[in-house]
């Protein structure tokens, strides 16, 4: 796969630096750290702050959802790799106004380990921290193990809900409660057509034939639930929607928000 790229080791810093230069009114790198990105006006007085983060390679997540009505800060790891606990602590300190910080991120082992470590140390330093972990990917675990599922595109709704509640100056407990309710009612499912190439690896992260697709593959190339021959757009949409609907206890009259 051909790329416009300089040194792969500089990829993440050049990426975040470019976005900051393009949007200087929205972002800043905290103390010059291009892995610790916060909204330009952080901390916002009296408001619960939303902290997020994860590996690079998923734009616009995570940095793209830092801003008014969304997250207040994000820590950025290498491509498909978790940011460090130290970066998470620096984000937490930079955005906390005294009203507390909600950690909001997808369920991946490395992210959970480092965010949990950052939360404990931040609490020891006098910052209130609560956590909501997004777990919307129905392909990664059965319904009875919803809280073990991976967090993927459904985090968009969590950002919007948490950000809106925080902007209304709700308490940390209330922001957490409403955001958790949104996460509990979010489902997603994806389909993969081809691999990506991680800059530092230099080769595709999985193999799939040109005439195949894989339903439910994870965003890092984790095995999905079914590999089949390519289908039409209508057939793919029907397949995904049926699986999502069957995973939720819908009743007549329910209203849903849809993200494609």
What spans do the regions from the language model cover?
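Flexible, glycine/charged-enriched surface loops at secondary-structure junctions
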Residues: 23-34, 169-178, 188-198, 246-257
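Gly-rich Lys/Arg/Thr-decorated short loops/hinges at beta-loop-alpha junctions or inter-strand turns
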Residues: 45-53, 62-75, 139-142, 213-229, ...
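Glycine-rich oxoanion-binding loops at beta->alpha junctions
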Residues: 58, 67-98, 245
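Internal, active-site/partner-interface "lid" segment
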Residues: 140-149, 159-220
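Short glycine-rich or small-residue beta-strand-to-loop segments that form or flank ligand, phosphate
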Residues: 2, 48-55, 71-74, 100-109, ...
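N-terminal amphipathic/basic leader segments beginning at the initiator methionine
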Residues: 1-50, 210
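Glycine-rich phosphate/diphosphate-binding loops and the adjacent beta-loop-alpha structural elements
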Residues: 203-236, 240-260
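Short, acidic/small-residue loops that bind anionic groups at enzyme active sites
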Residues: 74-79, 123-148
């Amino acid at each position: 796969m051909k790329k416009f790229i300089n040194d792969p080791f500089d990829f993440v810093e050049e990426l975040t630096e470019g976005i900051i230069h393009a949007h200087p009114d929205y972002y800043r790198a905290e103390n010059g750290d291009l892995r610790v990105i916060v909204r330009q006006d952080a901390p916002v007085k009296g408001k619960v702050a939303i902290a997020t983060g994860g590996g690079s390679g998923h734009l616009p997540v995570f940095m793209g959802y830092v801003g008014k009505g969304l997250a207040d800060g994000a820590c950025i790891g290498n491509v498909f790799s978790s940011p460090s606990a130290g970066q998470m602590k620096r984000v937490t300190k930079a955005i906390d106004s005294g009203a507390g910080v909600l950690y909001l991120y997808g369920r991946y082992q490395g992210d959970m380990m480092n965010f949990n470590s950052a939360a404990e140390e931040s609490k020891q330093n006098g910052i209130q921290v609560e956590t909501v972990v997004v777990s919307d990917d129905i392909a990664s675990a059965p319904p009875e193990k919803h809280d073990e599922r991976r967090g993927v595109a459904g985090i968009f709704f969590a950002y919007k809900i948490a950000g809106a509640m925080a902007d209304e100056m709700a308490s940390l407990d209330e922001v957490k409660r409403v955001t958790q309710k949104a996460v509990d009612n979010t489902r997603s499912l994806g389909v993969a057509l081809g691999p990506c190439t991680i800059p530092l690896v230099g080769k595709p992260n999985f193999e799939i034939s040109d005439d195949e697709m894989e339903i439910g593959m994870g965003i890092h190339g984790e095995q999905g639930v079914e590999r089949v021959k390519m289908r039409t757009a209508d057939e793919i949409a029907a397949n995904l929607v049926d699986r999502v609907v069957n995973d939720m206890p819908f009743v007549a009259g329910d209203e849903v928000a849809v993200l494609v």
